[in-house]
Amino acid sequence: MQKNMDTCPQLTIEVTDDGSATLFVPALDEHYHSVKGALTESQHIFIDMGLNHCTVAHPHILEIGLGTGLNCFLTYLSSKEQNRNIHYTGIERYPLNEETIHQLDYATLIGKGHAKAYYAIHEAEWEKDVHLSDTFTLHKIEGDFTQYNFQGKYDLVYFDAFAPEKQPEMWEQSLFEVLYKVMNPGGILTTYCAKGIVRRMLQTA
């Protein structure tokens, strides 16, 4: 059951250049994904440059900003293709409603017969381990990343917050220090943001 601790901001759906949909937040003047391609961005940043570079056989992954579930879904598909056991934790402050999830229609676009799994990501209970397949376990947290006390240790972090200029509270040095402490030695943090200040914070942490 969702706790609805916050009110989800108004959202509109837009189709990006690769044909996949994303969400636009008018209050922030910001999209959830690149308008050049939501699917393309997620695949490149989080799978190709993140998961596929993680050498841990059975990685524990933490996503900051579960959002549309696209990164989680692509990771699930990779776990099936590679027969690789993955434990996936995702934290989200503003869970999407059912109507929005269906309108995004990622399952039809890229699911290849795994539509049930995509919707299972969003239907999974919060705050407990849910086994979506023999190789993929999901643990969803409904909460505020800036206030949450993580208990696990992670091999790979998907940092998928909005841009620093749109959501500066998510990019504080102290938060990257928290992430560093919950990562296993040799862990990887991947994010779409390549600004110099972000690189320096990661190096300092």
Stretches with model-predicted labels:
Residues 69-73:
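Glycine-rich SAM-binding Motif I of class I
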Residues 58, 153-154:
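Local beta-strand N-terminus motif with an aromatic residue
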Residues 196-205:
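Conserved Class I S-adenosyl-L-methionine
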Residues 185-193:
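Conserved beta-strand signature within the Rossmann-like core of class I S-adenosyl-L-methionine
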Residues 100-151:
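S-adenosyl-L-methionine
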Residues 1-59, 76-110:
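Rossmann-like AdoMet
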Residues 155-170:
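A short SAM/SAH-binding and catalytic strip from SAM-dependent methyltransferases
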Residues 170-185:
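A short glycine-rich, Lys/Arg-flanked "PGG" loop and its adjoining helix->strand segment in the class I
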